[in-house]
Amino acid sequence: MADTPSVAVQAPPGYGKTELFHLPLIALASKGDVKYVSFLFVPYTVLLANCMIRLGRCGCLNVAPVRNFIEEGCDGVTDLYVGIYDDLASTNFTDRIAAWENIVECTFRTNNVKLGYLIVDEFHNFETEVYRQSQFGGITNLDFDAFEKAIFLSGTAPEAVADAALQRIGLTGLAKKSMDINELKRSEDLSRGLSSYPTRMFNLIKEKSEVPLGHVHKIWKKVESQPEEALKLLLALFEIEPESKAIVVASTTNEVEELACSWRKYFRVVWIHGKLGAAEKVSRTKEFVTDGSMRVLIGTKLVTEGIDIKQLMMVIMLDNRLNIIELIQGVGRLRDGGLCYLLSRKNSWAARNRKGELPPIKEGCITEQVREFYGLESKKGKKGQHVGCCGSRTDLSADTVELIERMDRLAEKQATASMSIVALPSSFQESNSSDRCRKYCSSDEDSNTCIHGSANASTNATTNSSTNATTTASTNVRTSATTTASINVRTSATTTESTNSSTNATTTASTNVRTSATTTASINVRTSATTTESTNSNTSATTTESTDSNTSATTTESTNSSTNATTTASINVRTSATTTESTNSNTNATTTESTNSSTNATTTEGTNSNTSATTTASTNSSTNATTTESTNASAKEDANKDGNAEDNRFHPVTDINKESYKRKGSQMVLLERKKLKAQFPNTSENMNVLQFLGFRSDEIKHLFLYGIDVYFCPEGVFTQYGLCKGCQKMFELCVCWAGQKVSYRRMAWEALAVERMLRNDEEYKEYLEDIEPYHGDPVGYLKYFSVKRGEIYSQIQRNYAWYLAITRRRETISVLDSTRGKQGSQVFRMSGRQIKELYYKVWSNLRESKTEVLQYFLNWDEKKCREEWEAKDDTVFVEALEKVGVFQRLRSMTSAGLQGPQYVKLQFSRHHRQLRSRYELSLGMHLRDQLALGVTPSKVPHWTAFLSMLIGLFCNKTFRQKLEYLLEQISEVWLLPHWLDLANVEVLAADNTRVPLYMLMVAVHKELDSDDVPDGRFDILLCRDSSREVGE
């Protein structure tokens, strides 16, 4: 395999295909002399998230998303970039690979960074995913020959599928016959590169001659309702294996969401389908794989390919159009065995396959269909035909067999219980139904009845429900029988005075429910305390008599619940009967010695549960009533005190250690906070000031103020320390609100940048003086700014209409349309090729002479700076500029002095990563242009030098005025981000060939030779007199 440039591997799911390339990648990464960068591509975003977790887990490889490479280029650290097929087919990716050597040399100034392996997982999708084949067309443009090796992996790619898939992406396909390695090395095709040589196939399934997936128990069931049957199976699994996980594959995205909505009350679910965004799919997949409390992953078939999930014990497929590949991939998720259920609705399995797709699986033996797909010998009608299917358990592991048996026993038990429920009276079925519902929905805060001297279905002579026992003075609850004595709850004991429910203890005058405490005249429910008089359950109050909240059906003599029996001294629950010594539950009756539960009755020696009645010797549960000798349960304040305690809630920006600030302390602050939230309502999202002004999203994309941060502000403007970072106020006066993502200070400096967009240097300097009262008050400045909101919006639309036309609508700039340019500059009469040659010549001279780039383009000063050209990365480059004082000179000579001292320096960080990506992509295009013209490829500047050039040109007053005069389609821009965007648009040269505007800028700059520029004429501030025609 190591001697073959392109290989395809088919191995069964769970075989360990990841390790086939994981170990070689680690070996490549360990080489010290050369840095290898490899790429892995998978079909779906869900699988991408799983691969990132698995490959980065060991720490041997530096793994990153391939989107980082597409947007920013190679970072020199990452060993493996992981992406999806759409990334592999993108033009940006293929361009970066085509220009790899040039980009590497410009970025790292070394040839020791090389392309390693190209790995494509589940590559059968190139052929079987019919609806996506149009998206794969861009892969044919990829330069496969640039890679050290190409590896194609799949668990479901027989020779015919593999050959067609490889040809579809532009490769030769599989080798038609096996070839000796010496013959391979002598092959002329190999000298032409990887793409021209056939791919060698390693079929590990045929070599083993074993049918895959025999370790999984596969069950095909036809049911009336797929969702109901699936829910039963899942509940049974989690009852047997509470820590296990399961996957459910649905047919449609709507079904996925419906199942997730209806099942989330039973267990924690994660759902995924193709309509979710890529980031959301990655986040949800990661959550399911890493969060042990997540039980079920529901999704369409994209959740079945390549995902490796620990504790996965069941896969359920509800898709009626499942083909053999999807079945194998789904079953293959059960790495260590488990259960796979194929649930289909009765009389609905027949389905036609769409053109070009594989047909759905047939009803019958699953193993035999798997053999047919892989080209293995059929065993139909022979011994060993069924492997893990059709009831055969021979090849299953002991754990899987045990799981099947436990599932069967549970199913039998549930079936027996169902038959018993059918035979019981309707009232009992009702009770069980409500109990099941209560498991998920009920709360323990409310009680239905109160008792005197007893607790929870336990009295001196009481009645317990659902039993057959006979006692002395009570009536059966929830039955229609009339008895002389009483009945014990779910026991067969007969007692004289009372019976303990759910315990084995017998007491003299009371019963402790679920406790072991003995009391004199009261009962503690769910506590172990011993009291003299009584203690309220779930409260801390002590009362004289006693009341048990969260109990039911307790009386002095007896209680009749949900029955029609008539007794002498009993209680009718859910009836309107009036008794002498009893308690009415859910009625309006008035009694002498009883307790009203959930009623408005007034009693003498009783307890009101969930009422507002006032009693003499009682405890109110979950109420705010005031009592004489009681305590309110579940209340936030003492009923016998007048104080109103208030929560101490601090705003997130408040330093709690320094300030004991309470929100009630300043009503003025709360009011101001509320007003600001209403005035700037979208600060909870990623809002920017252009949205606040009313610009559309497509306009914001090109006017957006990237690179604008606190360093844009001059010293002393919105930069005070020791205050709230969000609003620059003292902590006790902070007006930020919880959940605010975009601070008022950030909006203020963006608003300041908008004002800079509309003013030249002198006007902006005066503006900074005008807003001096707001230098320490960004909130006040925002209010001042918002007053002119409509006027500012209109002014930007007028002043930047030309800019939006060029950058957003991509209107063409032609030098031939500029009359002044044709008359006043030789550059405007040059061809595109001449402009490019001049550009490369300028950079060649700068490289040879080691000239300081920024200083040269600022004022044609050819000062030497060898450190700048020898710097190996961006940080060293910036340090070299700072060491020779470039940034200080720039601030003293130009409008850069109107920003913070670190502003220009920080432009070399990550502010302009999108622009950097576009520039590095253009290197590949320029390289191809040079090769097409027959010109010897010239070295082009790396990104940091290129950015230095544009900053120098931006701050060069003479050059700016000359360019704006000659090129009539552009006007002035006063923000560096806008200048950088403008420099990258394309211009039609005199011969109608396209060149980047920055190349035209360098040609104009070269034309303005230093001898033509008067010495010492650079103003400190960059100011343009629009009435003066420069250059005439």
UniProtKB/Swiss-Prot annotation:
Chain ranges for the short sequence motif DEAH box as given in the UniProt record? 121-124
Family membership: Belongs to the helicase family. Yeast subtelomeric Y' repeat subfamily.
Give GO MF terms, alphabetically. ATP binding; ATP hydrolysis activity; DNA helicase activity; nucleic acid binding
Q: Any idea where the Helicase ATP-binding domain is? A: 1-175
Statement: the UniProt record of this protein carries the keyword Hydrolase: yes
The protein's name in its UniProt record? Y' element ATP-dependent helicase YPR204W
Instruction: List the SMART domains hit by this protein, alphabetically.
Output: HELICc
Factors inducing expression? Induced in absence of telomerase TLC1.
Q: Name one Pfam family in it.
A: Helicase_C
Q: What keywords appear on the UniProt entry?
A: ATP-binding, Helicase, Hydrolase, Isomerase, Nucleotide-binding
Q: Does the keyword Hydrolase apply?
A: yes
- Its domain of life reads Eukaryota
Give the classification, highest ranks.
Eukaryota, Fungi, Dikarya, Ascomycota, Saccharomycotina
Gene3D superfamilies for the chain:
P-loop containing nucleotide triphosphate hydrolases
InterPro entries, per database record:
DEAD/DEAH_box_helicase_dom (IPR011545), Helicase_C-like (IPR001650), P-loop_NTPase (IPR027417), RLR_Helicase (IPR051363)
**Which GO cellular component terms are attached?**
cytoplasm
What this protein is reported to do is described as: Catalyzes DNA unwinding and is involved in telomerase-independent telomere maintenance.
Species of origin: Saccharomyces cerevisiae (strain ATCC 204508 / S288c)
PANTHER family in the record: FANCONI ANEMIA GROUP M PROTEIN, HELICASE WITH DEATH DOMAIN-RELATED
